Amino acid sequence: MNIIMEYGSCYDELEKEKWDFAFIGIGSEQRDITAIEALNGSVSNISSILYQPNDCALLVNEKFDVGVDDVEAYLENLGISENSKIILECTSLGFAEILVLMQALKNLNCKGVDALYLAPGHYARQHPDIY
């Protein structure tokens, strides 16, 4: 696994890439909205994801459920392969969504998975040199 971290006070300070697929949460905070808007124009296919604990499923694009055991098949039907470039917008996604997606992407041998997270502006790191 290769982990590369970038820091900036705004999205414009970060390296720009193009992705084939993005997975976003259904967030309503300004940080969520800003992070999702930052992906516009950089992604070919964007899907919103919300974990439904009572059904043990992901609600996709606020339209249909995909059971957690069927997520790999769903991703393959989207066209995701081991060579796909994928970004998870982790500001708006919850832990359950991230975990289910990461497990399915790992099982599909996807190597090009990035994560975007916008921390609240008032966060102050005590040790900025330690990750």
Identify the function of each model-found stretch.
Residues M1-K85, A96-Y131:
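Long, low-complexity, Lys/Arg-enriched
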